[in-house]
A protein has these predicted regions:
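ACP-dependent fatty acid/polyketide chain-elongation machinery
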Residues: 8, 12-96, 118, 291-303, ...
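Condensing-enzyme catalytic core mediating Claisen C-C bond formation in acyl metabolism
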Residues: 33-37, 63, 261-337, 345-346
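Conserved beta-ketoacyl condensing-enzyme motif
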Residues: 36, 59-207, 236-245, 341-357
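Glycine-rich phosphate/pyrophosphate-binding beta-alpha loops
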Residues: 44, 154, 208, 352-354, ...
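Phosphate/pyrophosphate-binding betaalpha-module
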Residues: 235-272
Length: 470
C-alpha cells in the first residue's frame, strides 16, 4: 500500500513538473465597462469605408441577379444585394479548401479589418502580425483572454445542394471531406479563432436575422463579466442562391414587384414596400474592457451601455402584432443602460421593408420612447430619428444585426443619422413623433449621448443594443 502511494506521489510530481503553466486568472466577476475599439465589414457596397460613404450619400446596392433572371426555376424575384464582383477573399484565407465557402470567407475578411482598425494586428500582402505595445508586450500575447463570437443565420445552403448533387451523381468518394466543416455555422468563428490564435470564448449563435446583434450582445457580456478582455464579435451570411431565394419566396418574405427597377426594391416604411431584398455580407466589432483599452491607448468609438433580448412566443415568421417582443427588448436595453428615452438620439431599425414588420416596429418604438413606460424615465420631448439602412444594403440576414450595430456606432461617433433609402411616401398611420430620415442623412446634435439598434428574427427572437458616448 505504501509503495503504491509513493509511486503515485512520484507520478504526480513528475506531471506537475512537465505541466503547462496555469491559465491567467480571470478578474473577479463584476460589471466591467465594455467599449468598441475596432470595426470591420464587407457589404454589398464593399468594405466599411465605402459602405459608410454610400449610406450617407443615399445610394442603394440592390441590383438584378443574372443567375436568378436567367434561371428556368421561374423564381418570383431577381433582385439581390450581393457583394461587389471586385471583392477578392483570397488574401484573408489560410486554407482555401476549408474557408472558401462565402459566409466563412466574409467573416475572415471583416474580422481582419476590425482587428486592424483596433490596432491589434498589422497586415501586409503576405502575413498578419500582432502589434506590440511600447514595452514589447504583444497585445494578443494572452490569447486565452481574447475570444470570438460570430454567428450566421443560415450558413451555406448552396454548399448543401451542390454536395448533394455530387453525392448522387458522382458517388461517396467524390464528396469532399470539407463538406461538413464548410456548412457548420460555428466554423466562421472557429476559423477566425484559428487564424489569429484567439483562445478565449469561442461562441456562435444562430438566431435567424437577430444573429449578429445577439453575437455582439453575448460578447459584450463575456467581457463585462470577466470571461474575456477582448472579443471579436459579429455576424456573417451568404445565401444568394436559388434554393434560399425560393425558400424565402415561399414564405412571402421577399420583394417581387420591382424586378424591372431593382434599385428601389428595398423601401422600409414606404407605402409601396412589398418585402425584403436578399443581401449578403459580414460585420465584426472588436469589444474591449475599458481599462484594457485605455492602457494600450486604443481608439474608442463608443461604449456598449445596454443589451436587451426577448421572445415573442407568437408565430414562426410573423412578429406579434402588439410589438410586445420588440418593446421588451428595447425596454430591457434602456433599463440596463441607465439612460432615459431622451438620451437616445437615433435608432437603426430592423425594418426589412415588409408591410407588417415595419409598421409593428414603428409602433413599438413609439410606445417605448414617446409614451410612459413603466420603469423608464419620462417620455421623449422631441422627434426621434429612426432609419432603416436596409433600404440601401438589402437584408443581410444573420449579418444584419452586426453590420447595423456598426452603423449605430458610427452614427454616434460622427453625429449623423444615415437615411432610409427609397422612402418617398410614409404610411398614413406611422407615428408622427418619429423622424424616419427619408432619402438624405441628417445631423445629430453634438451632445447626442446614445444610439440604439434593433434586430428581430423568425421564431420571434429579438435583440436591442444601446451604444453610449464615452
Amino acid at each position: 500500500m505504501i509503495t503504491h502511494l509513493k509511486r503515485g506521489q512520484q507520478l504526480l510530481l513528475r506531471h506537475l513538473s512537465t505541466a503547462p503553466p496555469p491559465l491567467p486568472r480571470p478578474p473577479p466577476i463584476a460589471d466591467r465597462r465594455v467599449v468598441v475599439t475596432g470595426l470591420g465589414a464587407v457589404t454589398p457596397f464593399g468594405h466599411l469605408q465605402p459602405t459608410w460613404e454610400a449610406l450617407l450619400a443615399g445610394k442603394t446596392a440592390t441590383r438584378t441577379s443574372t443567375q436568378l433572371a436567367s434561371s428556368d426555376l421561374a423564381l418570383p424575384t431577381h433582385v439581390v444585394a450581393s457583394i461587389p464582383d471586385s471583392f477578392d477573399p483570397a488574401p484573408y484565407l489560410t486554407n482555401a479548401r476549408a474557408q472558401s465557402v462565402p459566409f466563412i470567407a466574409l467573416a475572415l475578411a471583416a474580422a481582419t479589418e476590425a482587428l486592424q482598425d483596433a490596432g491589434l494586428i498589422t497586415t501586409n500582402h503576405d502575413e498578419t502580425q500582432t502589434v506590440t505595445e511600447n514595452d514589447n508586450h504583444h497585445v494578443l500575447s494572452v490569447p486565452e483572454r481574447t475570444g470570438v463570437a460570430i454567428g450566421a443565420g443560415v450558413g451555406s445552403l448552396a454548399e448543401v445542394t451542390s454536395s448533394h448533387t455530387t453525392l448522387e451523381t458522382r458517388g461517396l468518394r467524390r464528396l469532399t471531406p470539407y463538406f461538413v466543416p464548410r456548412t457548420l455555422i460555428n466554423l466562421a468563428a472557429g476559423h477566425v479563432s484559428m487564424k489569429f490564435n484567439l483562445r478565449g470564448p469561442n461562441h456562435s449563435c444562430a438566431t435567424a436575422c437577430a444573429t449578429g446583434a445577439h453575437s455582439v450582445g453575448d460578447a459584450y457580456r463575456f467581457v463585462r463579466f470577466g470571461d474575456a478582455d477582448v472579443m471579436v464579435a459579429g455576424g456573417t451570411e451568404s445565401t444568394i442562391d436559388p434554393l434560399s431565394i425560393a425558400g424565402f419566396s415561399r414564405v412571402k418574405a421577399l420583394s417581387t414587384g420591382f424586378n424591372e427597377n431593382p434599385s428601389v426594391a428595398s423601401r422600409p416604411f414606404d407605402k409601396r414596400r412589398d418585402g425584403f431584398v436578399m443581401g449578403e455580407g459580414s460585420g465584426v466589432l472588436v469589444l474591449e474592457e475599458y481599462e484594457h483599452a485605455k492602457r494600450r491607448g486604443a481608439k474608442i468609438y463608443a461604449e456598449i451601455r445596454g443589451y436587451g433580448l426577448s421572445g415573442d412566443a407568437h408565430h414562426i415568421t410573423a412578429p406579434a402584432s402588439d410589438g410586445r417582443g420588440a418593446i421588451q427588448a428595447m425596454k430591457s436595453a434602456l433599463l440596463q443602460s441607465g439612460l432615459s428615452p431622451n438620451d437616445v438620439a437615433y435608432i437603426n431599425a430592423h425594418a426589412t421593408s415588409t408591410p407588417m414588420g415595419d409598421a409593428i416596429e414603428a409602433r413599438a418604438i413609439h410606445q417605448v420612447f414617446h409614451t410612459e413606460v413603466q420603469g423608464l424615465a419620462s417620455a421623449r420631448e422631441s422627434l426621434l430619428k429612426v432609419s432603416s439602412t436596409k433600404g440601401a444594403t438589402g437584408h443581410l440576414l444573420g449579418a444584419a444585426g452586426a453590420v447595423e450595430a456598426i452603423f449605430a456606432v458610427l452614427a454616434l461617433h460622427h453625429k449623423v443619422a444615415p437615411p432610409t433609402a427609397n422612402l418617398h411616401d410614409i404610411d398614413d398611420d406611422a407615428p408622427t413623433e418619429l423622424n424616419f430620415v427619408p432619402l438624405e442623412a441628417q445631423p445629430l446634435s453634438n451632445d447626442a449621448r446614445a444610439t440604439m439598434t434593433n434586430s428581430f428574427g423568425f421564431g420571434g427572437t429579438n435583440a436591442s443594443l444601446v451604444f453610449g458616448q464615452i
